[in-house]
Amino acid sequence: MKRSKKYLAVSQMFDIKKRYPLQEAIKLTKQSQITKFDATVECAFHLNLDPKKADQNLRGALVLPHGTGKTLKLAVIAKGEQAKIAKEAQADYVGDEDLIEKISKNWFDFDVLVSTPEMMPQLSKLGRLLGPKGLMPNPKTGTVTDNVGQAVSEIKNGKIEYRLDKNGNIHAIIGKTSFEEHKLLENLKTLYLQLMRIKPRTAKGNYIKNVTISTTMSPGIKIDPITIA
């Protein structure tokens, strides 16, 4: 793959093979921004897990202490009182059968979809549309719930979803390059502590094999996992 001059210049700022202390890695990440806009900061944890094993296929959600800096559009499938609560919580779109019908016609002007358990039998019929886009509500991520007000509030305040991919990696957005260093550090630590809390009992050897941090379109900087705890 041909890299841009900016990418190559940034890659000279650090050693791609070295594992940096967390604080230094974050400082380098903020300095390595290629784009002119406020770039997204992402981290990736490479775990010594087999996603084919049910008990090792990690998936969940958590609220980052400083959010992600990203504004998400929320759609909520609910009726009656729950629909009213969702509107009061400032969900962008709220509906029941009408909203399900709209989605069935390839309307996807939202980033996260929340549903009450009551509406899931109808919504699940759209699995082929929502599944591949990662939009199908799931109890594990708190997007199937009777407490829609809390769900909307948490997502608006920086809740992220994480899932182990087929290569054993968990990718997550932890902020923007405009964030102060301590905010990026605390967000990354929050995800790290969550992954340690849910470590499968069947996990063997070195649980966290690699951790990298990067901005949009920039090379990844390796972090020494020992410096995160």
Swiss-Prot record:
Highest taxon above the source species: Bacteria
GO MF assignments: rRNA binding; structural constituent of ribosome; tRNA binding
Gene3D superfamilies hit by this protein: 3.30.190.20, 3.40.50.790
Pfam families assigned to the protein according to its UniProt record, in alphabetical order: Ribosomal_L1 (PF00687)
UniProt subunit comment: Part of the 50S ribosomal subunit.
Record function comment: Binds directly to 23S rRNA. The L1 stalk is quite mobile in the ribosome, and is involved in E site tRNA release.
Full protein name: Large ribosomal subunit protein uL1
Organism, scientific name: Phytoplasma australiense
